[in-house]
C-alpha cells in the first residue's frame, strides 16, 4: 500500500510543490516580514513571463497558418495574462517604502533589469535593441539574439494578413528580421482598408492592439509603483530606476 501511494501521481508530485515552496529564501536578518511577499511576487512574474513566451510562440504559429479563431483565442489569453500581471502590482503596493527599505540593501546588485525572460518577451514582440541583454550571461544573450533573427509577433501578423488576401509589400515581408520594424505607408493603407471591409481580420488586429495596450498599462503601473516606493533614487543593481522606466512608456509594440 505504501509503495503504491509513493509511486502514484499526486497534486504535490505533479506540480513539484515541495520544490516550489523551497525557492523562497529571504536574505534579510529576521528575516524582514515583507521580503517574502517581494520574492513571491517576482517569482510569480517569472512564471507568467514563461507562460507568455509559450503563448506568443503558439500564437505566431496560428497566425502564420492563417487560423483566425485559434489566433483570437491565444491573443485573448495573452491579454488576460497581462491583466493579471498588472493586478499583481496592487498586491506589491501594499508594501510601504519603509517596509521595502528594511530589506532593500540585501538585494545588492540584483535587479529586475536582469530578467532574461522579460527580455525574451520583448524580443518576441519585436524589440531589437540587443544591448539591453548585454548584462545577462553569454548563453542567455545568445538565446535572445536567436529570437531577434526570427519573426516577431507583428511579422507573424503580417503573414496572417497575406493569408487573408491582403497584399503586403515585399520589402516588409522579406526585410532583415534582426532589425526593428519601421512604419510602412502601404501596410498602414492595407490596415485602414481591412478595418472597413474585413471585420473578421480587423478583430485579430484589435487583439494585437489590446496586447500593446496591456503591456503599456503594465509598464505604467510598474513606473508608478517604483516611483512611489523609491522616488528618484537609483534602482537596485545600479539602474536609473524611474528615469529609465519612464522612457519605455512611449515605446508602443506595434
Predicted segments — roles?
Residues 1-254:
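Surface-exposed peri-terminal alpha-helical interaction modules
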Amino acid at each position: 500500500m505504501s509503495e503504491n501511494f509513493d509511486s502514484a501521481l499526486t497534486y504535490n508530485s505533479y506540480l513539484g510543490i515541495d520544490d516550489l515552496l523551497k525557492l523562497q529564501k529571504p536574505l534579510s536578518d529576521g528575516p524582514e516580514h515583507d521580503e517574502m511577499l517581494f520574492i513571491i511576487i517576482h517569482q510569480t512574474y517569472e512564471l507568467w513571463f514563461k507562460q507568455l513566451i509559450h503563448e506568443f510562440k503558439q500564437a505566431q504559429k496560428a497566425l502564420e497558418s492563417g487560423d483566425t479563431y485559434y489566433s483570437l483565442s491565444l491573443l485573448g489569453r495573452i491579454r488576460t495574462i497581462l491583466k493579471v500581471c498588472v493586478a499583481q502590482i496592487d498586491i506589491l503596493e501594499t508594501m510601504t517604502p519603509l517596509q521595502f527599505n528594511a530589506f532593500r540593501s540585501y538585494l545588492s546588485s540584483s535587479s529586475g533589469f536582469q530578467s532574461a525572460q522579460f527580455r525574451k518577451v520583448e524580443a518576441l514582440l519585436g524589440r531589437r535593441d540587443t544591448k539591453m541583454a548585454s548584462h545577462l550571461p553569454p548563453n542567455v544573450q545568445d538565446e535572445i539574439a536567436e529570437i531577434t533573427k526570427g519573426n516577431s509577433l507583428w511579422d507573424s501578423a503580417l503573414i496572417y494578413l497575406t493569408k487573408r488576401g491582403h497584399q503586403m509589400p515585399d520589402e516588409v515581408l522579406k526585410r532583415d528580421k534582426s532589425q526593428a520594424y519601421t512604419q510602412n505607408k502601404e501596410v498602414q493603407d492595407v490596415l485602414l482598408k481591412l478595418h472597413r471591409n474585413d471585420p473578421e481580420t480587423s478583430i485579430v488586429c484589435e487583439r494585437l492592439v489590446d496586447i500593446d495596450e496591456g503591456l503599456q498599462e503594465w509598464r505604467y503601473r510598474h513606473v508608478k509603483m517604483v516611483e512611489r516606493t523609491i522616488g528618484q533614487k537609483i534602482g537596485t543593481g545600479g539602474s536609473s530606476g524611474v528615469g529609465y522606466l519612464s522612457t519605455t512608456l512611449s515605446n508602443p509594440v506595434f
